[in-house]
């Protein structure tokens, strides 16, 4: 790594090699050549003077790009597309006259952008499916383990560790559905010309409108898409970038919510993210086990969520058939949204596949609060024995306030059970109260809800996407 120039943290620290390649110059320029081949093939099939020999020559040099020639040419003409047209022509002298025939720069530029987003979304989808599988395994393993629930981060009715995980999982499932929808509806720009009218192609096809329409269909098919935009200016609608980045923003929201929950749970010492044997949590405090991966998820997630505003502003600021104030912004914002989301999902998979659960801490915290939550059950049991509901309610209120003071003022343990057992109005014993205080009696349908959700919603997704399961993620720091 160079140390005397700026290096993007996405390359050095966060994004995977796979995502970095998708947004590399090599992927871009090889896609340009694939698009030029698709254009030549379609024009040949529609009767233009493009020979099979020329197409074969283009295909022979689809991968071995002469970058040195393109770079030198760009110094002269200051135009990246025409520089690569020239370089391709140097390698393909027979095909040189028909390279880029009828097209504008946006033919390769915009279509490549859509193809790149598709490839990046497919990688995101793969990692999202693996994240779903990881959390599903955790939820199933701990679906029956009662834990204290929190609303407003204050003690609330118990749930289970696994049921809580299904909340993270539900978010990911919604993200998966959105990714699938976006992938299914992506369209290429096609071959639209300088203002979207296909005027140059109409001229090439001697006024044959059907051939112009067929050209778009053929290009879409050859590049693996269902369709091209039916209408456009010079570029595809920049709203598409917003749709894609919003989709990534949804994933960031889900991962950030998970990371926040986990950081709080780690503070409570109930669940921790993985911690390597030789990992150092703090340069000053050697005992520290900081949730650095979860914190990084939160940090990168904020970036992705805010970054989604860039394509929104860009789409809203385009004038008529096009302006170029989109280019510099989208070159950075869309790519980095994918690089960051890729890094987030790698961290998410890494963390969820190695979560450390502390059952005794979870049980102790639950039991410290459960007596308060069980007072309704205790009161009803006493009423069945002949007690006065109103009198018992007041006594429970008084005992609860006193027990709460012991915990919060004196720093003692919750003695509510002892207080109620000692009060003759309740006609009960400590043993009878403890029999009521079984955590599994207070979790409602949490275990069943978890099992149903996994069986009915998650498992069908994992079965459908079984070929995507199994991904090795590497966390650089």
Task: Kindly label every feature range from the protein language model.
Residues 1-199, 205-220, 281-282, 292-296, ...:
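A helix-coil-helix interface module used to build multimeric assemblies
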Residues 20-24, 69-71, 279-299, 321-336, ...:
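Short beta-alpha connecting loops at secondary-structure transitions
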Residues 78-81, 128-135, 139, 165-179, ...:
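Alpha-helical transition-metal enzyme core signature, strongest for iron centers
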Residues 140-162, 272-288, 321-328, 353-373:
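Glycine-rich cofactor-pocket loops
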Residues 163, 242-250, 377-385:
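Short, well-ordered beta-strand elements within core beta-sheets of diverse protein domains
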Residues 175, 179, 226, 233-327, ...:
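Glycine-rich anion/phosphate-binding loop at the beta-strand->alpha-helix junction
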Residues 272, 395-402:
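Active/binding-pocket-proximal capping segment
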Residues 303-389, 395-398:
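Long, amphipathic alpha-helical stalk/connector segments used for oligomerization, subunit docking
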């Amino acid at each position: 790594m160079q140390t005397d120039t700026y290096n993007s943290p996405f390359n050095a620290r966060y994004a995977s090699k796979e995502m970095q390649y998708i947004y590399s110059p090599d992927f871009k320029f090889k896609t340009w050549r694939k698009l030029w081949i698709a254009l030549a093939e379609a024009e040949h099939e529609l009767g233009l003077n493009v020979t099979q020999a020329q197409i074969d020559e283009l295909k022979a040099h689809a991968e071995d790009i002469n970058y040195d020639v393109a770079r030198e040419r760009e110094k002269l003409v200051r135009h990246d597309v025409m520089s690569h047209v020239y370089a391709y022509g140097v390698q393909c002298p027979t095909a040189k006259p028909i390279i880029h025939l009828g097209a504008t720069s946006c033919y390769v530029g915009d279509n490549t952008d859509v193809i790149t987003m598709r490839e990046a979304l497919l990688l995101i989808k793969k990692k999202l499916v693996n994240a779903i599988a990881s959390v599903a395994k955790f939820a199933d393993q701990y679906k029956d383990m009662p834990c204290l629930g929190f609303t407003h981060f204050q003690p609330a009715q118990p749930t289970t560790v696994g049921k809580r995980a299904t909340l993270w999982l539900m978010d990911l499932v919604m993200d998966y559905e959105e990714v699938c929808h976006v992938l299914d509806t992506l369209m290429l720009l096609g071959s639209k010309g300088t203002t979207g009218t296909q005027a140059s192609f109409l001229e090439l096809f001697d006024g044959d409108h059907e051939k112009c329409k067929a050209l778009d269909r053929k290009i879409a098919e050859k590049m693996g898409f269902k369709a091209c935009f039916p209408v456009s200016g010079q570029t595809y609608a920049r709203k598409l970038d917003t749709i894609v980045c919003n989709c990534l923003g949804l994933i960031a929201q889900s991962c950030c919510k998970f990371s926040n929950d986990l950081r709080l749970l780690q503070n409570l010492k109930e669940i921790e993210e993985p911690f390597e044997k030789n990992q150092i949590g703090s340069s000053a405090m050697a005992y520290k086990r900081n949730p650095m991966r979860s914190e990084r998820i939160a940090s990168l997630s904020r970036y992705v969520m805010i970054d989604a505003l860039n394509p929104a502003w860009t789409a809203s600021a385009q004038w008529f058939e096009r302006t170029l104030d989109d280019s510099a912004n989208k070159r950075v914002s869309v790519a980095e949204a994918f690089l960051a989301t890729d890094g987030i999902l790698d961290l998410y998979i890494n963390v969820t596949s190695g979560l450390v659960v502390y059952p005794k801490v979870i049980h102790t915290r639950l039991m410290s609060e459960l007596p308060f939550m069980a007072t309704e059950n205790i009161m009803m049991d006493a009423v069945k024995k002949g007690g006065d509901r109103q009198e018992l309610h007041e006594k429970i209120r008084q005992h609860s306030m006193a027990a709460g003071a012991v915990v919060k003022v004196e720093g003692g343990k919750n003695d509510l059970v002892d207080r109620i057992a000692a009060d003759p109005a309740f006609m009960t014993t400590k043993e009878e109260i403890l029999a009521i205080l079984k955590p599994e009696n207070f979790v409602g349908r949490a275990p069943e809800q978890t099992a149903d959700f996994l069986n009915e919603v998650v498992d069908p997704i994992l079965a459908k996407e079984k070929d995507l399961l199994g991904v090795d993620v590497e966390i650089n720091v």
